[in-house]
């Protein structure tokens, strides 16, 4: 018999060492050096000497905080007792203004090393540090409902959440009680909560048809909590109240309609400030044709329509294109051309840009807008490009493309969309030279 020998994989060895933390990175991790290694330690702050269990890979080591030898004067007690277990908030041990300071410092360092120059840094957009989330997505598994644990798919059951809007946070204890009474646990995918005054909504994502008794319990819970109840297996169904509920939010003197499963920005206050700043920076006029790429349900499209001659809104999801069109019609705006288009398709993007634009607004998801930025850089392109990003890594890549193509980065600012977390959101304005 032939024997096949396989080389055993070497397990990575970890060792506890002392590390002096000098900065935070764009993931909110403490950064320091030890024995020639660059060390990343979640939960550590600049100025602290910590002990960490380090696992090295090349010249970099990832660490797990074991203790603090010296504690930063900036460290504060977290408001939430789930911190350290729940993966939702990474920075509650640091005051919100200092969170922004270190996020901006980390971004400046990244851009400096990439050779990207910023004309002017603008003050960050700020809002409430807690109680700001108007949407929540709760995981459900084996009868547990909550948020994912740090670095794991395990669920931490929660009865409160400091960053959730109080209208959503108040529902958590009753949801835990409700879940314990349901028989069809394995049919529950996850739960999405949404608060858009005056309405609160709950959408249960299902993998199969719920037992009749379970659905009756969901309806009874919704009635007792005054929550609009929806389920989705394939199509979305509203179960309570009987009359259709009109979900939406005001913005820039407009009313934007929203479906229970639609993507919206989680932070209403920052969203309002973000749109106002975008309009001020891009400054569209009644003689201009403007592109709104990754347009969603019209969060930027409709404010642009109020100011520009014409707006072409491009989105990859047909349902969002339809929502954008409906929102424009409901607000009496007739200068919107909403299209469904794959912005990762170079040919489609080339054809789109060939029609000509004076200005463009880009608001992509985390993968960024590489194909679109390549096309903008390669052609004559609009004179102004405003880029809203939720991922500095892909934004940095795309910014380099625009700069290489003749654009200048004239101003940049952070937006505190996700206070208490490591997430970094930014807005940047590029102007074509010459």
Give, region by region, the residue ranges found by the protein language model.
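Terminal RNA-binding accessory module
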Residues: 1-82, 152, 165, 338
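Rossmann-like S-adenosyl-L-methionine
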Residues: 2-26, 181, 209-434
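Short acidic-glycine loop/turn motifs at beta-strand connectors
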Residues: 34-35, 57, 140-144, 150-152, ...
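Residue-level recognition of conserved beta-strand edge/terminus positions
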Residues: 53-55, 139, 431
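Extended interfacial segments that mediate partner engagement and assembly in macromolecular machines
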Residues: 66-78, 84-188
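Short, solvent-exposed loop/turn elements at beta->coil junctions and helix N-caps
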Residues: 122-129, 190-193, 234-238, 413-417
């Amino acid at each position: 018999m032939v024997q096949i020998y396989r080389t055993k994989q070497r397990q990575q060895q970890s060792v506890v060492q002392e590390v002096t933390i000098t900065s935070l990175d764009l993931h909110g991790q403490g950064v320091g050096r030890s024995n020639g290694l660059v060390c990343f330690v979640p939960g550590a702050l600049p100025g602290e000497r910590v002990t960490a269990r380090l696992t090295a890979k090349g010249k970099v080591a990832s660490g797990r905080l074991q203790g603090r030898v010296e504690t930063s004067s900036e460290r504060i007690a977290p408001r939430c007792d789930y911190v350290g277990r729940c993966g939702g908030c990474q920075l509650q041990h640091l005051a919100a203004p200092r969170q922004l300071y270190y996020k901006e410092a980390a971004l400046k360092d990244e851009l400096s090393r990439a050779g990207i120059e910023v004309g002017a840094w603008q003050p960050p957009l700020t809002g409430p540090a807690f109680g700001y989330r108007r949407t929540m997505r709760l995981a459900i598994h084996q009868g547990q409902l909550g948020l994912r644990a740090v670095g794991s798919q395990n669920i931490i059951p929660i009865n409160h959440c400091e960053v959730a809007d109080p209208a959503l946070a108040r529902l958590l204890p009753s949801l835990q009680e409700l879940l314990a009474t349901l028989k069809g646990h394995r049919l529950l995918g996850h739960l999405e909560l949404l608060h858009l005054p005056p309405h609160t909504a709950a959408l249960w994502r299902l993998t199969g048809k719920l037992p009749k008794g379970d659905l009756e319990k969901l309806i009874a819970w919704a009635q007792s909590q005054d929550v609009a109840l929806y389920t989705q297996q394939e199509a979305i169904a509203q179960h309570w109240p009987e009359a259709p509920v009109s979900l939406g939010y005001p913005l820039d003197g407009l009313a934007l309609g929203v479906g229970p499963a639609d993507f919206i920005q989680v932070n209403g206050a920052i969203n309002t400030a973000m749109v106002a700043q975008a309009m001020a920076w891009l400054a569209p006029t009644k003689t201009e044709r403007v592109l709104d790429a990754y347009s969603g349900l019209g969060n930027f499209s409709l404010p642009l329509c109020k100011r520009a001659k014409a707006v072409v809104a491009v989105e990859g999801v047909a349902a969002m294109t339809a929502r954008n069109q409906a929102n424009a019609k409901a607000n009496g705006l007739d200068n919107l051309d909403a299209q469904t288009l794959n912005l990762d398709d170079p040919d489609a993007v080339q054809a789109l840009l060939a029609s000509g634009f004076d200005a463009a607004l880009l608001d992509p998801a985390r993968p960024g807008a590489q194909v679109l930025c390549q096309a903008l850089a390669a052609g004559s392109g609009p004179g102004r490009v405003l880029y809203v990003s939720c991922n500095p890594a892909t934004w940095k890549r795309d910014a380099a493309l625009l700069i290489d193509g003749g654009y200048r980065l004239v101003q940049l600012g952070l937006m505190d969309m996700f206070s208490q977390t490591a997430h970094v959101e930014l807005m940047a304005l590029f102007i074509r030279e010459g």
